């Protein structure tokens, strides 16, 4: 079912308000080193992660009680026809270390499809907003991916190589060998920069729904493509692997590289 523009406008305005609130909480706490807990999966969480998510969940429950919510730090996921997906601090390790690549990720899914996505980085005053069927905006202005003539000219971003399992490392190595430059550890900002035409490719693993859902409307609305490593469009059941490109032709080549590397 195609959503009315008025509904998309209302949800987008509401999501921007959520991002404003999360950003204010992050900015207020940025100067102090937070208390850190290591979760069972060895990732980090802080009291601020939980506080931000709880605040956003409360706002959603008040405004849209019939919507579902899935969050990284919250309780049991509630899935409805329309479901909000929250990552209160993407790049928690960077936040703990004071590196300004962390941010809040917000998405709205209609059934299995992300239709709204926000990457908000209060530390750099950057925000990317993607809405299905509309051009992506960075800082309020339309942004677009760039054409890339060949993989040997491409700039690749990737998460920490330590995140890749022994079985996945050949895919990363193949991408590293095929591209001109590599940038690691950019967290959510790396995907915003791809949407703005600053980088060309991104490869990741160990991702959950809240890590990737916002990227779909943001990258697609900027002219790019984002899938799993098999070339399938991302949905609620996807993960943990992601491959994104600003130029669809380079995405096809990268998929072939990854497939060959994993089959060797």
Language-model-detected regions and their locations in the chain:
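N-terminal subdomain of lithium-sensitive/metallo-dependent phosphomonoesterases centered on the IMPase/IPPase/PAP
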Residues: 1-89, 264
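DPxDG-like acidic metal-binding loop motif
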Residues: 79-137
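Residue-level signal for inorganic ion chemistry
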Residues: 22, 26, 49, 60, ...
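A structural micro-motif at secondary-structure boundaries
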Residues: 138-142
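Acidic active-site catalytic centers that drive phospho-/nucleotidyl reactions
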Residues: 49, 53, 72, 87-90, ...
